[in-house]
Amino acid sequence: MNKEQFLEKIKGGIIVSCQALPGEPLYSENGGVMPLMAKAAEQAGAVAIRANSVRDIKEIQKAVSLPIIGIIKKDYLPQKPFITATMKEIDELVATSCEVIALDCTLRERHDGLTINQFIKKIKEKYPTQILMADCSNFKECENAYSAGVDFVGTTLSGYTEESKKQDGPDFELLEKLVEAKIPVIAEGRIHSPEQAQYVQKIGVDGMVIGGAITRPLEIASRFVQAVESVEKL
């Protein structure tokens, strides 16, 4: 699958992020949970899956026939980038044959000492046909990553870095700016409702990832609990 085929596949659809980290209720040392999430997403009509870790990706590949955006989350403290942050993670993801690899493309200091542009160049040299998605937090990062050679950008990290604006919902302003600049973009981050997803779609994005609103029951339940508790009794 090449970039054009992937973008055509996800056009007008929903990519569901199926992830659980250690310490979260749906995380299991033995695995087996995320492929069930992915199977439910596929039955609902999702067009692709975003997944974290080699184990989960392999399990999901056996459960569904959807393309996968693969990542590996690993801390390299004190540096902040942790989404597919070094060539080691790239190598491991390539070995899974996942269709797309997403990586932190912020301009923050990296563990490997490379600039993000140097890292992208090395990946493209080593794996010239691998589709790459840039997880970014602002327009400057997206513009830089796209010019450096990634296939499309994602607003994944908007609101989660010091270089971006914190907000409760999707970063509509950033999405609009990227579409206007004709930079291929997958919307991701805090799309909590079908209405927000509709608005994102109308902006003209190439695709969208929804995670917490679908596959994180703790987050979903908490939102309902907070809403009910905030209502004054009649």
From Swiss-Prot:
<dbReference type="GO" id="GO:0006053">
    <property type="term" value="P:N-acetylmannosamine catabolic process"/>
</dbReference>
<dbReference type="GO" id="GO:0047465">
    <property type="term" value="F:N-acylglucosamine-6-phosphate 2-epimerase activity"/>
</dbReference>
<keyword id="KW-0119">Carbohydrate metabolism</keyword>
<dbReference type="Pfam" id="PF04131">
    <property type="entry name" value="NanE"/>
</dbReference>
<dbReference type="InterPro" id="IPR013785">
    <property type="entry name" value="Aldolase_TIM"/>
</dbReference>
<keyword id="KW-0413">Isomerase</keyword>
<dbReference type="InterPro" id="IPR011060">
    <property type="entry name" value="RibuloseP-bd_barrel"/>
</dbReference>
<dbReference type="GO" id="GO:0005975">
    <property type="term" value="P:carbohydrate metabolic process"/>
</dbReference>
<dbReference type="InterPro" id="IPR007260">
    <property type="entry name" value="NanE"/>
</dbReference>
<dbReference type="GO" id="GO:0019262">
    <property type="term" value="P:N-acetylneuraminate catabolic process"/>
</dbReference>
<comment type="similarity">
    <text>Belongs to the NanE family.</text>
</comment>
<dbReference type="GO" id="GO:0005829">
    <property type="term" value="C:cytosol"/>
</dbReference>
<comment type="function">
    <text>Converts N-acetylmannosamine-6-phosphate (ManNAc-6-P) to N-acetylglucosamine-6-phosphate (GlcNAc-6-P).</text>
</comment>
<comment type="pathway">
    <text>Amino-sugar metabolism; N-acetylneuraminate degradation; D-fructose 6-phosphate from N-acetylneuraminate: step 3/5.</text>
</comment>
<protein>
    <recommendedName>
        <fullName>Putative N-acetylmannosamine-6-phosphate 2-epimerase</fullName>
        <ecNumber>5.1.3.9</ecNumber>
    </recommendedName>
</protein>
